[in-house]
């Protein structure tokens, strides 16, 4: 088995690459950690990896064949994705990589579809007794309300709407927007909960972090806390069919 690892969309994830390198050599002294990026020269993490490869955009029809070729030529045994837009295409091609003895650290396709479409995500959470913001009729709204795209990422196209004047026709006409009650941050604290699931689909680790500062939808400054959230989540999401590796869930909790 090949022990080299490749981390995709390296970007600014310097600490992540360094952690993988430091850990990997404890088990396989000669193993290397490679990276990919659309623009390696401008990716800080590329410079701390053992080599960075320029790749196409993940939505390009040739992306998978290019990535597979890189993996074969560099004896890659594991692919570690880092952004949510990669997950669907990698999950769809998981078997292709497995057939070439390459493990893709991504959950099964059905679970990825649940996560990538917030309409499905809401149904999933409710089935596991986790409350979600109530849906709002955009033509008969109660203010304030919140709107976000069902397939959104990086905190883009979000709308905090305080009154009828702010509910513009452009917002009403956007077919991707979901409308819901606004959750007041003065009443609830916001957390990102990092979780790790094994190949048996059972949770192995739960780490809640209070979200203090956000950058492009990701927590930039946070505080790790031990709180009732750990037991709350363990009781409800102890096992998720098709879930493997790292996932995170964002919650409001008081």
What residue ranges belong to the model's regions?
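Short, charged, surface-exposed secondary-structure boundary motifs
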Residues: 63-66, 107, 113-117, 216
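Short gly/pro/ser/thr-enriched loop/turn and capping motifs at secondary-structure boundaries
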Residues: 41-43, 87, 110-114, 214
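Phosphate-binding site of ATP-dependent enzymes
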Residues: 162-243, 252-253
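Catalytic phosphate/metal-binding cores of nucleic-acid and nucleotide-processing enzymes, i.e., regions
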Residues: 249
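Active-site nucleotide/adenylate-binding loops and adjacent lid/helix of ATP-dependent enzymes
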Residues: 109-187, 197-202, 227
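Flexible, glycine-rich phosphate/dinucleotide-binding loops
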Residues: 14, 42, 153, 167, ...
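ATP-binding N-terminal substructure of ATP-dependent carboxylate-amine bond-forming enzymes
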Residues: 1-105
